[in-house]
Swiss-Prot record:
One of its GO terms (molecular function) is tRNA-uridine 2-sulfurtransferase activity. It comes from Streptococcus pyogenes serotype M2 (strain MGAS10270). It catalyses: S-sulfanyl-L-cysteinyl-[protein] + uridine(34) in tRNA + AH2 + ATP = 2-thiouridine(34) in tRNA + L-cysteinyl-[protein] + A + AMP + diphosphate + H(+). The keyword tRNA processing applies. This is tRNA-specific 2-thiouridylase MnmA. Disulfide bonds join 103-200. The record marks 128, 344 as: Interaction with tRNA.
Length: 373
């Protein structure tokens, strides 16, 4: 049996059940485990309640239960500079960002990894549902989590080979239901705790209200593609391509009673374009351009390959051909795709392996840019 006692693993503990079980499993496997709570955002609400304080209490309770030391580290400045400023800049540009991808790249697997190294870590571990596999040459492959419904490789697609070399994902082979069972069997303080959802710095707050604190909303016209005025929009940043709710149109303006969707934006004119029908022609495209192209292991600077891709979390894979030039790529779809959204991540897969991905800049239909920003 391998002696893991000389291998130090620093676990990012959020106060949730996944990271609690991560720490427990590593401790049971004999590793030298340290728990670290990351405070990335000052989320004190109007009543003076800070959920981070509650979460840290849960981390402390679990760490005491399983018998590991624990610390708290403050990354609020790094998070603001590297994640939140990016989030705001993307909204200013009319795009729909994915802060989770950037948080993993810049905070959980950069700032936190650097901090863990100062604690003498050999590895860091998190409660993500993903797997790492090492070959005989030492190359690390990132694979989808065994639980298809929970797989989080989409959000980890910007991790580098160097980051993956130092990372363990102890939950990757488990189903979420098994993780809960392990927590309950061990009597962990977080066993019954509800999973957090949504963007961490928004939490339970109203998204529109939150965003308007940082970006002034500019109302404008809502139009159909053929120029019919459909009323007023509240500010382009509040709408995403393919969105159905929150338009305030209803079926009364259309002859066919189909629901209305956001089908485009014109940032220069401050116009929101809407159209009827889930598969409205303005929502369909057959290729995209992406930048910040990044692979989880070494690849040539220029090459073309076929694979499957996701254009948003929780969607089935689609067959694509990818033409890579340095850190940019053209991605051509085998079948037309709906609501390809600038600012979101496109992530490439070869079977179970997550190859990497990039950020969507523009969608195209028959070579013409879609009016999405």
């Amino acid at each position: 049996m391998t002696d893991n006692s000389k291998i130090r693993v620093v676990v990012g503990m959020s106060g949730g059940v996944d990271s609690s079980v991560t720490a427990l499993l590593l401790k049971e496997q004999g590793y030298d485990v340290i728990g670290v709570f990351m405070k990335n955002w000052d989320d004190t609400d109007e009543f003076g309640v800070c959920t981070a304080t509650e979460d840290y209490k849960d981390v402390a309770a679990v760490a005491d239960q399983i018998g590991i030391p624990y610390y708290s580290v403050n990354f609020e400045k790094e998070y603001w500079d590297r994640v939140f400023e990016y989030f705001l800049a993307e909204y200013r540009a009319g795009r729909t960002p994915n802060p989770d991808v950037m948080c993993n790249k810049e905070i959980k697997f950069k700032a936190f990894l650097d901090y863990a190294m100062t604690l003498g870590a050999d590895y860091v571990a998190t409660g993500h549902y993903a797997q790492v596999k090492r070959d005989e040459n030492g190359t690390v492959y990132m694979l989808r989590g065994a639980d298809n419904g929970k797989d989080q490789t989409y959000f980890l697609s910007q991790l580098s080979q160097e980051q993956l070399q130092k990372t363990l994902f102890p939950l990757g082979h488990l189903q979420k239901s098994e993780v809960r069972e392990i927590a309950e069997r061990a009597g962990l303080a977080t066993a019954k705790k509800k999973d957090s959802t949504g963007i961490c710095f928004i939490g339970e707050k109203n998204f529109k209200q939150f965003l308007s604190q940082y970006l002034p909303a500019q109302k404008g016209r809502m139009m159909t593609i053929d120029g019919r005025d459909m009323g007023e929009h509240a500010g382009l940043m509040y709408y995403t391509i393919g969105q159905r709710g929150g338009l305030g149109i209803g079926g009364q303006h259309g002859g066919d009673n189909q629901p209305w969707f956001v089908v485009g934006k014109d940032l220069s004119q401050n116009i929101l374009y809407v159209g009827q029908g889930f598969y409205h022609e303005a929502l369909m495209s057959n290729s995209l351009d992406a930048s910040v192209i990044h692979f989880t292991r070494e690849m040539p600077e220029e090459f073309t390959f076929e694979c499957t891709a996701k254009f948003r979390y929780r969607q089935p894979d689609s067959q694509v051909t990818v033409h890579v030039r340095e850190d940019k790529a053209e991605v051509v779809f085998a079948e037309p795709q709906r609501a390809i959204t600038p600012g979101q991540a496109v992530v490439f897969y070869d079977g179970k392996e997550c190859l990497g991905g990039g950020m969507i800049d523009m969608a195209y239909k028959n070579g013409q840019p879609c009016q999405y920003i």
